[in-house]
Structures are given as C-alpha cells and as structure tokens.
Amino acid sequence: MIDEAKRLAPRFAARAEAYDRDGAFPVDDFADLRQAGLFGLMVPERLGGAGAGFARYADVAYELARGNGATALIFNMHASVTGALSGVTDELADALGLPPEALEARDAHLKAAANGSWYAVAMSERGAGSRLSQMSTSYEAVDGGFHIRGAKTFCSGAGHADGYLVAARSAADPSQVSQFLVPAGPGLRVE
C-alpha cells in the first residue's frame, strides 16, 4: 500500500493547485484512492482489506500528503472510521454486550470499505464544535432502528462520502452519546 501511495502522490500534486483554487473536492484523487484499494487499508484481511495498523496507515498518509494535504486529511477521516470499527474485536464486543447485529453491521461496513466505499466524520455542531459534551444532535430508538435529529456544521468530504459517522445524544438518556454510521441517501441532507 505504501507503493500505491507513492505512485499516487505525484498525480495528486499535479491536481492540488486547481482543487485549491476552485475550492473543489478532490474527486479524481478519491477515484484513484478507490481504484488503488486504499479505502480498505485498515480493514481486516478476513474482510477483504489490507489489515494495516496505525503505523502503516501513518506511512501511507504521509506519502499521500506529499501529493495533496487536503486529500490526505479527508482520507484520514475515513481511516479513523475504519480503524475504529476494526478495533472493535469480537472479544471486545462480547465484553461490551453488543448484540450480534452490531457485529454484522461492523463487518458489512468494513467489507464495503474494502470494496471501495469511503466514510466521512460528521461531528462538529454550531456553538459546540466537536465537543461531545455540548452536542445537541439526538437519537431515539424506533421500530427497525434509530431516528437521528440534528445538524452538523462541518464535515470534510460532505456530499461525496458513501456514509457518515455521526455522533448523537440519546433522547431518553442525554448522558449517553453514541455514534452511528449513516449511509448517504434518503433521510440525510447535505447543504
């Protein structure tokens, strides 16, 4: 994967000035990342990924940043999601009392990343930044899942990601904060 990042960096560098000048999302960079399989960097091998840990991720991110720092930063958001999901081992999930459905969802999202899906982090809110203690986005359990209400004010890659890691506070118990991987599509609006 390091070799892929080194190969891509000059391509990213050649496009970086135009993306910055136009204030545009680096669409071609992300197409290259997808084609190179880098969205599966931190996905376990058993789920089709490269199984990289943090040190290998940092080496790859360094090479990507040599080409375009903005692309590397947005890629970092994706890696933080896949790295966190990969860190929830079956043993940890069992110790936390997570239901089997949570593990199935974890594996499905990680397999999707290994196949080219990428995820952004939607955390920041007006007046709260990314401080979870001041967040107002809330969720409640509904038949078949959860309903999340709220607005995030900043998200690197908004409008381009396949899913968003969204932090929300329980409407029933405001002291409880959970994170949801929300797929792009109906019910999610990016402005």
Please name every model-derived segment.
Residues 22, 44, 71, 129, ...:
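Generic secondary-structure boundary/loop-capping signal
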Residues 9, 119-120, 168:
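Glycine-centered structural positions embedded in regular secondary structure
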Residues 151-190:
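A short core secondary-structure module
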Residues 132, 190-191:
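A short, acidic/glycine-rich surface segment
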